[in-house]
């Protein structure tokens, strides 16, 4: 049997579930929430017509999905060596040879190209922000910082917080204070979220020689960093006062709840893994609740 035939068989075995793994669909979906919220708030706060903005919102979501999925696929291509070492990554199609490198790269660059075309069709700022997100995630995070510094998570938070900016700019064409506030929410959220995950997988990261903060500096140092980011996040809702006092109060309570949960780790004999799991779950719910709340509150202003 020829090598080409074997490779074609490999790619033919990639199903939809495996494709979702390749493009990290869970991560993409999580980022689409703030992207949509950014676009929606731009529609409401700048008095755009919702009906006339629907095509822009859909094109923005489609383009964002493609560039994020393509960047994640490229990340999977680059990380194959360390993924083969980490037990939790063994089911990835890129690890068990369910997709060839050639097809993986074609998928990645194809998605990013089409995604960028979509964003540039909206306006130049959207396309530029998309490019910044791609370069930041692939180059500064995946290729450089992830393998060389414990600041990798913070560095990766910059491109990770771009989606709400793209959403806003797709409608308004320029960045505003509200868009920056949404960016800051996602930016501050990411270290807490990913440090919690890294605590649970610190042995895996150490095995793969990835300098994640818990693996290099230990649990105590990591929880202090998480708490610092929680404190930084606390006043950010004040920047969204134009959504009303009710939103600011509810968002602040959401932040205070997270801080309260974070403080439980300073009790004696607290279970590190259990606490990290609780913080991780809260982080997932936080992002959804925060941005859904922003959308709902903005809807009430239209009634």
UniProtKB/Swiss-Prot annotation:
Enzymatic reactions: heme b + (2E,6E)-farnesyl diphosphate + H2O = Fe(II)-heme o + diphosphate
Domain of life per record: Bacteria
Known EC number: 2.5.1.141
InterPro entries the UniProt entry points to: Protohaem_IX_farnesylTrfase, UbiA_prenyltransferase, UbiA_sf
Function in brief: Converts heme B (protoheme IX) to heme O by substitution of the vinyl group on carbon 2 of heme B porphyrin ring with a hydroxyethyl farnesyl side group.
Subunit (UniProt): Interacts with CtaA.
Membrane protein topology class: Multi-pass membrane protein
One GO-annotated biological process of the protein: heme O biosynthetic process
Organism this protein belongs to: Staphylococcus aureus (strain NCTC 8325 / PS 47)
Gene giving rise to this polypeptide: ctaB
Family classification: Belongs to the UbiA prenyltransferase family. Protoheme IX farnesyltransferase subfamily.
Other comments on record: Carbon 2 of the heme B porphyrin ring is defined according to the Fischer nomenclature.
HAMAP family per the UniProt record, alphabetical: CyoE_CtaB (MF_00154)
Name this protein carries in UniProt: Protoheme IX farnesyltransferase
Short name of one Pfam family: UbiA
